[in-house]
Amino acid sequence: MFGMGSKTIVGLDVGSSSIKAVELKKKGGQIEVAHLGLEALASDIVVDSMIVDSGTVSSAISKLFTDCLIKTKAVATAVSGHSVIVKKISLPSMSDQELAETIEKEAAQHIPFDLADVSLDYQILSEEAGSANMDVLLVAVKKDKILNYTNVLSMAGRTPSIVDIDALALQNCYEYNYQPAPGQVVALLNLGASVMNINIVKGTTPLFPRDVSVGGHQYTDSLQKELDLSFDDAESLKLGNKVGTVSEDAKAPILQQVTEIIVLEIQKTFDFFRASAAGEHIEKIYLAGGSAKVPGLMEALRQEFSMPVELLNPFQRVVPPTDGPGAELVEQNPGQLAVAVGLALRSFESL
């Protein structure tokens, strides 16, 4: 959204529990992974989508690039959370130049921040010939939020070329890998550690991007407290691994309680969407993110919403690495790399 592209861009997803880096290359008629890696972060380094400890994150980025042998300087990253506002607005049809001249005035009516404090971007969603109106997606991000991320990238010796938002990077990943039919409406869910990005998409048009302040850390916190576990053991248990003598009967109800909270937030979002998009029907849910594979979550979504639910695979068309740590990451949980892949695909915008 914000910034200028360059030839090759590394997709860098700075999350609450880890940093993911993906660099892609074009080979023949395909796009394949050149470099890919993940660096874990302690839970107090990135809090509520803000980088609290810049030095630690900067060092982690440098280490990740060194370990992955990434020499490219240009980086695309993404932000989410309370400092990000995304609104679909309807305006009288006008030329691109007229829109550029009036967008700030229109934004002032829809953005709950002082416009001096935000960076604005917009995208025309639909403009039918002869129609009196046009739909525009308005994106506003607080400048201090952008600086919070770009300063850390600069500290790590990288060039912040693009700052996107997570929900749109997720969509970019989906579009390239799944090549959706123009009328197909799906819900993309990215369940990170502290934030869930939701983007309801029709074909290649974002209809309803939204961030919700629930995430995988709630599973981990509940398991820690209820079963008196360390953070690492709770995290492992959350992802379906066996830990000590903890039984399935002890774990399942704790996971289910958090799943119910997450499902409720998704239900609210779907209700908001249906109220604002008359006649549109969500056909399928794609689930991504580090906590997408929590036991019971996919089944709960299928039961609650009575529609197909599947894990979003960022390597449906993007060719993954075949060996090394990158291949292991893809095998373990490809969905946690969806935002980073979507960002890295910005290198090939014309495809």
Regions found by a protein language model. Give the residues of each.
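Non-catalytic, solvent-exposed interaction/assembly segments
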Residues: 1-106, 147-149, 157-159
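Glycine-rich phosphate-binding/hydrolytic loop that grips phosphoryl groups
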Residues: 292, 310-351
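Glycine-rich phosphate-binding loop plus the immediately following alpha-helix
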Residues: 43-46, 143-172, 178-180, 205-246
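Phosphate/pyrophosphate-binding loops at sites that engage ATP/ADP/AMP, CoA/4′-phosphopantetheine
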Residues: 61-74, 156, 229, 267-284
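Gly/Thr-rich phosphate-binding beta-strand-loop-beta motif of the actin/hexokinase/Hsp70
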Residues: 1-40, 59, 74-78, 132, ...
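Active-site neighborhood for divalent-cation/phosphate handling
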Residues: 78-178, 284, 314-321, 336-339
